[in-house]
């Protein structure tokens, strides 16, 4: 009996410790990719993106080590009510050395409270920095609806026929035409706080296994007292989105139509900008002080249309497929817009449940509104892959690859500069008038990719 009494407090203590550890368990999620590559003509791996496009086909075409490390925890729960704390720190380096220092990006720090409002069961209120309901095309790493940033909102309000979400976020624009110049201190400039107000209605049943999501985003400059917008900067804009998702073939197809105006056209994903983001100009104030507005051309007034179809499906036990097709037209009053269309496929053949071969073929074509010239590029990658499962989404994965790219460009390339600016054909400013010409290249290497 004495032995039993001695063991009982110990057992209770151990059990309590285990239960406490479970209750306080920290969730660890994230994403990472890294590898090594070479270029056929010599040197480290090059990556290929057509000048003027906002993205590139990514398989065998990523030249950096990148990671997002997420730590989160449910810190309080009572019945169906709870608070969850979430964080995310991101890192990116050039993968050229053992020791590569970098400043981390603190991308998320937010608290989400579920079922806290009695008369809105199922809803979540939140505040802080957050990846907010992002919509993207994985195979080209393209985010077409993304208002992420510091903000607050309420989501998943059940209306019976769909779920309503409301949010406000901020995306500060530094050093450009949305920068204010002080009316009182002429040598002082200030970054611009651009606010976005987002309304989404999701889960609208349209057909068997098909749902519709509708969204409206309004972005504007939030001016600081005593400062003014640079002359010609776009003050605000709208973006409208309709996305239909069809569940099919053990996967999905998404069809998207978007329209944006003025400040919402530069990034085209729901965040406001007051400029087109390509050039630079210097303003000389009355006292002789010169202020350089770097990497911006003011006045992105105009509109943008985007039609997008993408998905991932299974074509039987041995085949999976990713695909994308998109047309985008940015028509600006300053004549520096672009017309971009892209199409690509990534079939996967599964030799075993953990080994596969992938082939990615992608084509981009971008027309300069100013010059009327076109840049085009196609990229082909063949990869042998070992992954944790038999799906095209299975990760972690280790792959060896060979990539071939061929391009023919006639506008907008800055040698040794930022060759992905879609507004680089600013011939009236005397910059960005060259092109990559007509050439090709191939690369090969190995890469790991993981999310968890």
From Swiss-Prot:
CDD domains to which the protein is assigned, alphabetical: Maltoporin-like (cd01346)
SUPFAM superfamilies per the UniProt record, alphabetical: Porins
Sites annotated Important in sugar transport: 143
Cytoplasm in keyword set: no
Reaction equations catalysed: beta-maltose(in) = beta-maltose(out)
GO cellular component: cell outer membrane; pore complex
Topology of the protein relative to the lipid bilayer: Multi-pass membrane protein
GO MF annotations, alphabetized: maltodextrin transmembrane transporter activity; maltose transporting porin activity
tRNA-binding as UniProt keyword: no
Extracellular face of the membrane: 36-64, 94-104, 131-148, 174-191, 223-234, 264-300, 334-336, 370-372, 411-436
Described purpose of this protein according to its UniProt entry: Involved in the transport of maltose and maltodextrins.
Name of the protein: Maltoporin
């Amino acid at each position: 009996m004495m032995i039993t009494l001695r063991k009982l407090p110990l057992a209770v203590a151990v059990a309590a410790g285990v239960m406490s550890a479970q209750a306080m368990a920290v969730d660890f999620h994230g994403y990472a990719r890294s590898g090594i590559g070479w270029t056929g003509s010599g040197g480290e791996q090059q990556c290929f993106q057509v000048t003027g496009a906002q993205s590139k086909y990514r398989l065998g075409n990523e030249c950096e080590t990148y990671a997002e490390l997420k730590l989160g925890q449910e810190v309080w729960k009572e019945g169906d009510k709870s608070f969850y704390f979430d964080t995310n720190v991101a890192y990116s380096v050039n993968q050229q050395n053992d020791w590569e220092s970098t400043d981390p990006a603190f991308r998320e720090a937010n608290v989400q409270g579920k079922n806290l409002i009695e008369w809105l069961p199922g809803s979540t209120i939140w505040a802080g920095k957050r990846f907010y309901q992002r919509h993207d095309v994985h195979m080209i790493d393209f985010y077409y609806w993304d208002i992420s940033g510091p903000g607050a909102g309420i989501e998943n309000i059940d209306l019976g026929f769909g779920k309503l979400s409301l949010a406000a976020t901020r995306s500060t624009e530094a050093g450009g035409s949305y920068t204010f110049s002080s009316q009182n201190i002429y040598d002082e400039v200030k970054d611009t706080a651009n606010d976005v107000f987002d309304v989404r209605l999701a889960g609208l049943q349209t057909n068997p296994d098909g749902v519709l999501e509708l969204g409206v985003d309004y972005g504007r400059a939030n001016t600081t007292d005593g400062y003014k917008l640079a002359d010609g900067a776009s003050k605000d804009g709208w973006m409208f989105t309709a996305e239909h998702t069809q569940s099919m073939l053990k996967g999905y197809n998404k069809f998207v139509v978007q329209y944006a105006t003025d400040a919402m056209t530069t990034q085209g994903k729901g965040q406001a900008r007051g400029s087109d983001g390509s050039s630079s100009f210097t303003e000389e104030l009355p006292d002789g002080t010169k202020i350089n507005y770097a990497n911006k051309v003011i006045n992105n007034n105009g509109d943008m249309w985007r039609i997008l179809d993408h998905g991932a499906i299974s074509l039987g036990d041995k085949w999976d497929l990713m695909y994308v097709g998109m047309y985008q037209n940015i028509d600006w009053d300053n004549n520096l817009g672009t017309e971009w269309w892209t199409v690509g496929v990534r079939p996967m053949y599964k030799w075993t449940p953990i080994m596969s071969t992938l082939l990615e073929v992608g084509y981009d074509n971008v027309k300069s509104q100013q010059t009327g010239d076109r840049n085009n590029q196609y990229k082909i990658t063949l990869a042998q892959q070992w992954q944790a499962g038999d799906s095209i989404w299975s990760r972690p994965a280790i792959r060896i690859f060979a990539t071939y790219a061929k391009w023919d460009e006639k506008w907008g390339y800055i040698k040794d500069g930022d060759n992905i600016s879609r507004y680089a054909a600013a011939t009236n400013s005397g910059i960005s008038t060259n092109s990559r010409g007509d050439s090709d290249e191939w690369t090969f290497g190995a890469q790991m990719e993981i999310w968890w």
